[in-house]
A protein has these predicted regions:
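Flexible, solvent-exposed loop/hinge segments and secondary-structure transition points
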Residues: 2-185
């Protein structure tokens, strides 16, 4: 009888206990690593965002010149800053291919003309969806009137061939920025 009981322990219960302990230890280690790296990741994200804001606003040379804007209600807009000359940089995020986020920052002067655009499509398929962030593709938006929504295939702006979901996400995020600009204007 004890042999059957011992056999049941060895074949059924022991593996479950061992795997549970291993899973618990792994979870604790992952939580520890996450708590140590989360502040570093947040700081790097903030630094990247501030650099992108400065990059899309030609009148600004340093992020300390920017003033954070609040009070907007436009969906998917995650940040707005204002330069001393009244130009704005607006950040929006939309879902691209496979749910990956496409982040867009559009700079607009006080008249609503696009002054720069920055795109992070690193979550999109490399070489296909990520191509919506390439400078050659983004040049088509130079000087665009950002007081009206941008329609893919109209006014000289086209989507990226082979990157339908990423292109739609890019245009949706740009239009989120346009809508926010109009809300704040």
């Amino acid at each position: 009888m004890s042999k059957t009981s011992n056999s049941n322990w060895e074949t059924t219960v022991k593996p479950i206990v061992v795997l549970s302990v291993i899973s618990l230890v792994d979870s604790l280690l992952l939580a520890l690593v996450n708590s140590m790296t989360a502040p570093v990741i947040a700081e790097n994200t903030k630094r990247t965002t501030l650099a992108a804001y400065v990059g899309v606003l030609p009148s600004v040379s340093d992020a300390t010149e920017l003033e954070e804007v609040t009070g907007y209600t436009t969906a998917n807009v995650t940040g707005v800053v204002k330069a001393p000359d009244g130009s704005l940089a607006i950040k929006a995020e939309e879902s691209g291919f496979d749910g990956g986020i496409v982040t867009v920052i559009v700079g607009m002067d006080a008249n609503g003309t696009e002054t720069g655009i920055w795109v992070d499509a690193s979550t999109q398929t490399k070489g296909i969806g990520s191509a919506v962030a390439e400078d050659d593709f983004l040049k088509q938006f130079d000087g665009l009137d950002c007081t009206q929504n941008v329609v893919m295939g109209e006014n000289g702006v086209d989507g990226k061939t082979g990157a339908t979901f990423s292109s739609k996400a890019l245009f949706a995020a740009i239009n989120d920025c346009v809508n926010c600009y109009n809300e704040l204007a």
